[in-house]
């Protein structure tokens, strides 16, 4: 399993995303290295099809494909992990979203609840 975290230096939240990713991989006993990929220019963003920071891809698949919009140096938002009547957004993916993506990549179905 290949795990990438793409980020833009203008994003102060990418290390929080990395920490959540590490926690999920550790909790699920995966010893998978995380490839950190800095996106430093609009040209890099185009080349990497970078939809914003932070972006986590597992085996080249974005963990939140519904959130992929315009390509460029910008910040992304993700649905929070809590169950609400309406959508609330966070600047980093929640552990539940990350875990479900990891489990799909491992062939474990739709993911388990925390």
Regions inferred by a protein language model and the residue ranges of each:
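Non-globular targeting/processing and membrane-anchoring segments
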Residues: 1-33, 37-51, 55-114
């Amino acid at each position: 399993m290949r795990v990438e975290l793409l980020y833009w230096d203008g994003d102060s939240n990418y290390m929080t995303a990395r920490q959540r990713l590490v926690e999920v991989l550790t909790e699920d006993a995966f010893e998978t290295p995380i490839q950190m990929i800095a996106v430093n220019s609009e040209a890099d963003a185009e080349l990497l099809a970078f939809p914003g920071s932070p972006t986590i891809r597992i085996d080249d698949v974005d963990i939140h494909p519904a959130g992929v919009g315009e390509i460029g140096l910008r910040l992304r938002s993700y649905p929070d992990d809590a169950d609400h009547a309406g959508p609330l957004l966070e600047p980093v993916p929640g552990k539940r979203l990350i875990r479900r993506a990891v489990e799909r990549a491992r062939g474990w179905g739709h993911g388990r609840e925390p």
